[in-house]
């Protein structure tokens, strides 16, 4: 049974690709049609490929794998942090620092500095220092927290990386490839899918689309770690029943697209 229904994908605007002039021809197999200058993603394929991604992440989590969630674009930042945290995993939701994976030892020294600064604040060290020095240390801590807070407690290089918009996160993609770390990613119609191990064809610009798919990847981690989540299964079953009533075919989706521009912002 599908972990996400056609109805859920449609309501979140997952089917909206980019403008036809901004496409990557390698995404052609995942495109259903074109409407009003926008490519429409084939949601029947997306449903199946989300299932594959879900099972891939679930199996990795069941083997005690470390999953890193990555999404630094504005539309993804909140979802990436919230869902990774909910799943007990790790995230990068601001600028990816070059060498985060390939120069892990150096990154660890910066993380140690972050932890030291937190300890200094907690144990009262700051109270014994000049205000000007404390101000500088606080700024340093805030900067380190912003870029490294999501991986502060990551025990090792991740076993799987989930990425929102690999086109934007090219440095992360290259580092993962160099270290042979599998990449699961939301891939829009303007992106080269060849760089990704497990593809989820989808709109990667709409906040609702990003949140929906990111939350399902978090669900996969939770299920892998704790066993099958009955609530998730029951909700999926209910959603699929509802979907049969409202979305019978891709033609229904195309009809829904006509005149609907809500999910095409920033395209």
UniProtKB/Swiss-Prot annotation:
It comes from the Bacteria. One of its GO terms (molecular function) is structural constituent of ribosome. CDD domains: RPS2. SUPFAM superfamilies: Ribosomal protein S2 (SSF52313). PROSITE patterns: RIBOSOMAL_S2_1, RIBOSOMAL_S2_2. Residues 224-244 are annotated as: Disordered. Residues 235-244 have a biased composition (Basic and acidic residues). GO terms for cellular component: cytosolic small ribosomal subunit. One of its GO terms (biological process) is translation. Keywords: Ribonucleoprotein, Ribosomal protein. HAMAP family: Ribosomal_uS2_B. PANTHER family: 30S RIBOSOMAL PROTEIN S2 PROKARYOTIC AND ORGANELLAR, SMALL RIBOSOMAL SUBUNIT PROTEIN US2M. Belongs to the universal ribosomal protein uS2 family. This is Small ribosomal subunit protein uS2. It comes from Lactiplantibacillus plantarum (strain ATCC BAA-793 / NCIMB 8826 / WCFS1) (Lactobacillus plantarum).
């Amino acid at each position: 049974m599908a972990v996400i229904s056609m109805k859920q994908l449609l309501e979140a605007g997952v089917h909206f690709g980019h403008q036809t002039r901004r496409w990557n021809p390698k995404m052609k197999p995942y495109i259903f049609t074109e409407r009003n200058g926008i490519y429409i993603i084939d949601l029947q394929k997306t449903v199946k490929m989300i299932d594959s991604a879900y099972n891939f992440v679930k199996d990795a989590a069941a083997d005690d794998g470390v999953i890193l969630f990555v999404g630094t674009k504005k539309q993804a930042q909140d979802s990436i942090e919230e869902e990774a945290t909910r799943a007990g995993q790790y995230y990068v939701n601001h600028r990816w620092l070059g060498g985060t994976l390939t120069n892990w030892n150096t990154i660890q020294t910066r993380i140690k500095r972050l932890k030291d600064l937190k300890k200094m604040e907690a144990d009262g060290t700051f109270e014994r220092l000049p205000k000007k020095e404390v101000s500088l240390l606080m700024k340093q801590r805030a900067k380190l927290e912003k870029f490294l807070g999501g991986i502060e407690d990551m025990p090792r290089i991740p076993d799987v990386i989930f990425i929102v918009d690999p086109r934007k996160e090219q440095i992360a993609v290259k580092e993962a490839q160099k270290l042979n770390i599998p990449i699961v990613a939301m891939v829009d119609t303007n992106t080269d899918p060849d760089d990704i191990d497990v593809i989820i064809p989808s709109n990667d610009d709409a906040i609702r689309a990003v949140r929906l798919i990111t939350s399902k990847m978090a669900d996969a981690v939770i299920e892998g770690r704790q066993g099958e989540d009955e609530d998730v299964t029951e909700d999926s079953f209910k959603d699929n029943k509802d979907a049969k009533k409202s979305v019978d075919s891709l033609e229904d989706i195309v009809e829904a697209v006509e005149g609907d521009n809500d999910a095409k912002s920033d395209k």
